[in-house]
C-alpha cells in the first residue's frame, strides 16, 4: 500500500511495478501529454485500442467531482489496473481535484488498509462483494462520498448486501468510449431501478433498441452501444442485456441477463453461494440452447425446484435446457467475468472429449 499526492513533484520510491506505473502516468499527465491509449476490457469481445484526449478525461473527472462533492485532500482508493479506463480515471480524478491517492495492488480480494478513511473508489462487482462480506473492511468507507461499481452487472446478492449500508454506493454505466461512467443508480440508498445520466449526457435508442450516447465526453458524437435498453422520457434507462449475447433458441430470443436475475434470486432463497451465468451453446435441434453455467467443482442437482421457480417468472422456452458446472470461470485482467472465453473453453474441451471417444 502506498499513499501519494499525484500533483506533487516528488514521489516516494515505488515498491511494486503497479505503483511505478501509476507514478509514470501522473508524470505524463503533468507534462501535458494530450493523447492516451487504452484498451477496452474484452469482456464482450476482442479488446481494441482507443485513443482519448486529456480534455475528455479532465471533463469526466470534473463531472464526477461536481456530482459527488469532491474536495482537495479527500482520499481516493485505487485498486483497479490503470491500463483500463475505470482504473486510470481514479488517478485523473485525484490529479484534477488534488486528492490523496491510496494505491493497492489490483485484486478481486483487495487488501484495504485499516484506519484510512476513503472518500472515493471505483470497483468491479467481485471487489465490492468481497468488501461487503467483510465487516473489518467496511469501516474505511463510512464517510465515503461515492463507491462506484461498474464494468459488469451486479448480482442480486451484491445488491442486497449494498442496501444494508448507509454510505453511498452507485452502480455506474459507461465504457472506454465514454471515458468512464455517464450514468448512475444508487444501490445503497435505493430510489428506483433506473440509471440516470450525468448532466450534459444525451441518450436515445437506435432501430434495434440499443442505447446511443452523446456528450462532451464523446466529443459530441453519437456512440452506438450493443446494449439493449429501455429508455424513459426523462432519460432514465435500464440495460436489458447485450445484443450480441442474445440466444436465438428455436426462434425464441432469450436475453441471458433477464434469466440470470431470477436464478440469482433462487440461489439466495436456497442459500446457494456460487457464481453463475446463462449463455447459448450450439444445438442440433434448437440452433442454440440456453445453458446455465455454475462455477463449482461438483455438480449442482437443482432439478425440478429451479425449473418450477423459474416458471413463475419466465416462459418455459426461456428456461435453461441444461446445467453445466465448471471448476473455474475465466476472468479478464480487469477482474470481470469473461463468459465468452469460459464458454469457448468448455466447448473446446467438450469437443476434445468427444473426439477421444470416437
What are these regions (language model features)?
Residues 291-293, 306-358:
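Conserved C-terminal "lid"/linker of ANL adenylate-forming enzymes
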Residues 202-224, 228-230, 295:
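AMP-binding/adenylate-forming core of the ANL superfamily
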Residues 1-19, 58-77, 107-119:
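Conserved ATP-dependent adenylate/AMP-binding module captured primarily in the ANL superfamily
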Residues 52-59, 75-130:
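AMP-binding/adenylate-forming
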Residues 35-62, 69-71:
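Conserved AMP-binding A3 loop
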Residues 226-318:
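AMP-binding/adenylate-forming catalytic core of the ANL superfamily
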Residues 18-39, 72-73:
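Conserved pre-ATP/AMP-binding loop-to-beta segment of ANL
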Residues 134-190:
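Gly/Ser/Thr-rich phosphate-binding loop
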Amino acid at each position: 500500500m502506498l499513499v501519494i499526492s499525484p500533483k506533487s513533484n516528488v514521489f516516494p520510491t515505488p515498491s511494486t511495478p503497479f505503483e511505478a506505473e501509476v507514478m509514470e502516468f501522473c508524470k505524463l499527465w503533468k507534462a501535458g501529454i494530450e493523447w492516451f491509449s487504452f484498451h477496452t476490457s474484452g469482456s464482450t469481445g476482442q479488446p481494441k485500442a482507443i485513443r482519448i484526449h486529456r480534455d475528455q478525461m479532465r471533463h469526466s473527472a470534473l463531472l464526477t467531482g461536481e456530482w459527488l462533492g469532491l474536495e482537495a485532500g479527500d482520499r481516493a482508493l485505487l485498486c483497479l489496473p490503470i491500463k483500463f479506463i475505470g482504473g486510470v480515471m481514479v488517478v485523473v480524478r485525484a490529479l484534477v481535484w488534488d486528492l490523496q491517492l491510496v494505491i493497492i495492488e489490483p485484486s478481486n480480494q483487495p487488501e484495504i488498509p485499516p484506519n484510512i478513511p476513503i472518500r472515493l473508489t471505483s470497483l468491479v462487482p467481485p471487489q465490492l462483494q468481497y468488501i461487503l462480506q467483510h465487516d473489518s473492511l467496511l469501516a474505511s468507507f463510512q464517510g465515503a462520498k461515492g463507491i462506484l461499481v461498474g464494468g459488469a452487472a451486479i448480482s442480486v446478492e451484491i445488491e442486497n448486501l449494498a442496501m444494508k449500508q448507509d454510505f453511498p454506493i452507485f452502480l455506474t454505466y459507461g465504457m472506454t468510449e465514454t471515458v468512464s461512467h455517464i450514468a448512475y443508480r444508487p444501490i445503497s440508498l435505493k430510489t428506483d431501478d433506473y440509471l440516470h445520466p450525468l448532466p450534459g449526457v444525451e441518450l436515445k435508442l437506435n432501430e434495434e433498441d440499443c442505447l446511443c450516447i452523446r456528450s462532451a465526453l464523446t466529443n459530441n458524437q453519437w456512440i452506438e452501444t450493443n446494449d439493449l435498453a429501455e429508455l424513459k422520457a426523462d432519460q432514465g434507462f435500464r440495460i436489458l442485456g447485450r445484443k450480441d449475447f442474445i440466444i436465438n433458441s428455436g426462434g425464441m430470443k432469450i436475453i441471458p441477463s433477464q434469466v440470470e436475475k431470477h436464478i440469482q434470486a433462487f440461489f439466495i432463497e436456497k442459500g446457494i453461494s456460487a457464481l453463475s451465468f446463462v449463455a447459448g451453446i450450439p444445438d442440433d435441434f434448437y440452433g442454440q440452447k440456453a445453458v446455465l453455467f455454475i462455477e463449482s467443482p461438483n455438480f449442482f442437482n437443482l432439478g425440478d425446484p429451479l425449473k418450477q421457480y423459474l416458471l413463475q417468472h419466465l416462459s418455459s422456452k426461456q428456461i435453461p435446457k441444461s446445467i453445466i458446472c465448471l471448476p473455474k470461470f475465466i476472468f479478464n485482467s480487469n477482474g470481470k467475468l469473461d463468459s465468452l472465453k469460459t464458454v469457448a473453453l468448455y466447448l473446446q474441451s467438450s469437443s476434445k472429449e468427444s473426439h477421444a471417444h470416437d
